[in-house]
């Protein structure tokens, strides 16, 4: 089993995530390879794509949005990401039925979450795009509380009913899944696919973010050990295992490259995928510097890598 230095781990993570020589051919390819681009702030998600796709323009991105080649839904860690539409099912498969705070929150307000979701879907089916204000009117007096931090939109997204229309600086409109695909919900859910959502997530993670530890995957996915460990242990047999300077096992789907050159400095935007994907924060920055990157209230600053 080959050992890796901290520098080799860092350089190969930069390489595999599309920041060095191995860049992606399109925004859709980058979004798919990384299994989503965190985008609660749309402009920072776009910077993550500009850094990984040569010659990408704002016009290219807008075409991808207009053609619905890229959509926004809630995914890992219950945060908004840009995904390709084909990956929506995998997000649903992993997260839709996980216990989360949404149902309890609705109950605490005296509202039935399932009933709310039915009403929201009825509104979505009547219009191509529905504004946040229209949903607020539908939800009534409790609208603000039901929509806080994404609220009921999160479950609607995880259920495969609604997606956010990508727009800067933040989401204003939502659309139904039938704007992308006319497939009925029951067929969309039951159609056979070559991999489960969890298998797909694990494979993409160790391809784009390896070398990484099991704890890193847990951090990135936001899942509990019992949600993933059995499947992960089976898939790890197909990956390459390395030993880091800290004595931990690091896994990668691809063989690591030696003598990776960074070349020119890299300016990564806030919430770049590299900075939300690892449990150990000092893999690239010193302990002193990490507090300047990871701020309070979950904020992650832009970073210049020299």
Annotated model-derived regions:
Residues 1-272, 287-306:
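Long, low-complexity intrinsically disordered regions
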Residues 283:
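PLD/PLD-like phosphodiesterase catalytic module centered on the HKD motif
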Residues 277-280, 306:
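C-terminal accessory/binding modules appended to enzymatic or scaffolding proteins
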């Amino acid at each position: 089993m080959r050992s890796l230095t901290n520098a080799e781990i860092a350089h190969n993570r930069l390489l595999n995530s599309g920041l060095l020589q191995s860049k992606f051919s399109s925004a859709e390819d980058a979004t798919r390879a990384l299994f989503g681009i965190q985008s609660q702030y749309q402009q920072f998600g776009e910077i993550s794509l500009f850094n990984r796709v040569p010659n990408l323009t704002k016009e290219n991105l807008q075409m991808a949005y207009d053609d619905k080649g890229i959509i926004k839904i809630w995914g890992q860690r219950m945060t908004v990401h840009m995904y390709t539409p084909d990956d929506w099912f995998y997000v649903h498969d992993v997260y839709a039925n996980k216990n989360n705070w949404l149902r309890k929150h609705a109950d605490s307000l005296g509202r039935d979450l399932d009933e709310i979701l039915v009403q929201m879907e009825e509104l979505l089916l009547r219009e191509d795009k529905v504004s946040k204000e229209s949903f607020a009117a539908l939800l009534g007096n409790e609208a603000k509380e039901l929509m806080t931090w994404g609220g009921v939109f999160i479950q609607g997204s995880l259920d495969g009913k609604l997606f956010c229309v990508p727009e800067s600086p933040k989401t204003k409109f939502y659309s139904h899944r039938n704007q992308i695909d006319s497939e009925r919900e029951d067929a969309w859910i039951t159609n056979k696919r070559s991999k489960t959502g969890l298998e797909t997530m694990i494979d993409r993670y160790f391809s784009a973010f390896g070398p990484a530890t099991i704890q890193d995957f847990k951090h990135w996915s936001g899942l509990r050990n019992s949600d993933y460990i059995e499947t992960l242990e089976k898939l790890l047999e197909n990956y390459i295992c390395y030993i880091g300077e800290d004595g931990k096992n690091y896994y990668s789907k691809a063989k690591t490259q030696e003598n990776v050159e960074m070349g020119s400095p890299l300016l990564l935007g806030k919430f770049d995928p590299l900075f939300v994907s690892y449990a150990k924060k000092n893999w690239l920055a010193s302990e002193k510097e990490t507090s300047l990157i990871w701020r309070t209230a979950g904020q992650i600053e832009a970073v210049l890598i020299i």
